């Protein structure tokens, strides 16, 4: 979206532009919920940009609105921050959202905190391949056995496993994927 910015808006013009993006985001989410009333939830990503961190009041109110419109809606911990910029868990240690989305390209080492919590592990086939990567030379690529091991381990800890694929602009997959 051309109105999105990673840094926090500073000028009146930037704030106006980013507010346009926030309105667009809200309308898109509401449209999805209207068009797909049987949907179960949203999977979000990107709570590290300063613009989103500073929008904690917007995201708090939007989450509240989405839940009022669709009781039982499942929202992951990457949707919003608290007012102090804390992600996944607020400043009081409470999880933001319905399940923990902090396991990106890695699995939990200490599993004691998982007891009774829903979580997911988001994995790429190359080390950091979000989206299409033309050149994979010199990169370790996870094997089928690696992926199956991660899937089985995630499930053994009652986690969900999300595997990212990066097709090119024509929808074709890299041979290694």
Regions picked out by a protein language model, each given a short descriptive name:
Residues 1-177:
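Mature catalytic domains of secreted/periplasmic carbohydrate-active enzymes
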């Amino acid at each position: 979206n051309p109105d999105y910015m990673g840094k926090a808006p500073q000028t009146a013009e930037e704030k106006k532009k980013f507010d346009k993006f926030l309105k667009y985001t809200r309308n898109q989410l509401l449209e999805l919920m209207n068009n797909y009333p049987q949907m179960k939830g949203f999977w979000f990503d990107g709570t590290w940009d300063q613009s989103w961190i500073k929008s904690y009041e917007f995201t708090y109110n939007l989450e509240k609105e989405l839940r009022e419109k669709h009781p039982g809606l499942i929202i992951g911990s990457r949707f919003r921050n608290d007012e102090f910029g804390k992600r996944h868990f607020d400043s009081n240690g409470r999880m933001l959202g319905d399940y923990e989305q902090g396991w990106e390209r890695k699995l939990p080492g200490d599993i004691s905190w998982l007891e009774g919590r829903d979580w997911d592990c988001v994995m790429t086939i190359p080390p950091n391949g979000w989206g299409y990567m033309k050149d994979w030379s010199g990169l370790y690529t996870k094997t089928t056995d690696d992926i199956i091991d991660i899937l089985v381990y995630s499930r053994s800890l009652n986690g969900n496993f999300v595997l990212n694929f990066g097709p090119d602009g024509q929808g074709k997959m890299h041979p290694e994927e």
